[in-house]
Amino acid sequence: MTMCKPVQDKLVAGEALCAIALTEPRGGSDAANLRLRVERDGDFYVINGEKTSISAADQADITVVFGRTGTPESGAHGVTALLVPMDTPGLTTSRFDCHGQRSIGRGSIFFENVRIPVSHRLGDENKGFVQVMHGFDYSRSLIGLQCLAVARVALEETWEYITQRQAFGQPLSAFQGVTHPLAQYDTEVEGARLVCLQGLWLKDQGLPHSAEAGMAKWWGPKLAYD
């Protein structure tokens, strides 16, 4: 892990961007059933497979890749985390056309015989599942807030529109059939935001927050979509 400190310094200084490569095409963030293969070859690991729906896939300077070093039957006990520079030979990316997330974007990362020194391993071999699960609840609350930002902007633009648009000699905002649904969504967006903040506050206090994180991850994206 000799190269981790310089990378950490760059990340803290805002000089580098890191992606988290966990999700795979066959399913969501199911860390216990990863298929991307990571095989030991002397002082190197060789990576083959695909990660998909990865935030900043084509913008990141480096990515933390979670892959299977154990057998498929080993489940959660055969996952290892590696720090992989995005300019490593054999690594390619593609970008999705994502509405609402253009500043960050998402995409796929493809690994074809990508060789990474053993020194790039984060933690112990086959122990990566524990590492990623520790960060899941924190990220779920943040994802909820990210989606709610889109919902909030959509509501603000809609309120502005109905106060300007005229119908039957009045602004649309004068009609309760128009404003009542918007008021309901305003209430729900604010409620979901507080759930996200509660989850983050509980984490800061060192308290259990898995339930709140799950609520945040479900409610925030749903409201943004609705």
PLM segments and residue spans:
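Flexible, small-/acidic-enriched active-site or ligand-binding loops
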Residues: N33-R35, D87-R115
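N-terminal glycine-rich flavin-associated loop
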Residues: M1-T2, G28-A31, F44
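Alpha-helical interface subdomain recognition
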Residues: K10, G14, R40-Y45, S108-F110, ...
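Glycine-rich phosphate/pyrophosphate-binding beta-alpha loops
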Residues: T52-A57, G100-R102, Y138-L142
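Active-site-adjacent elements of ketosynthase-type condensing enzymes
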Residues: A13, R26-R35
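A short core secondary-structure module
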Residues: F44, N48-S94
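Internal helix-loop-helix
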Residues: M1-G14, S55-I62, K203
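A short, Trp-centered hydrophobic/proline-enriched beta-strand micro-motif
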Residues: G14-L22
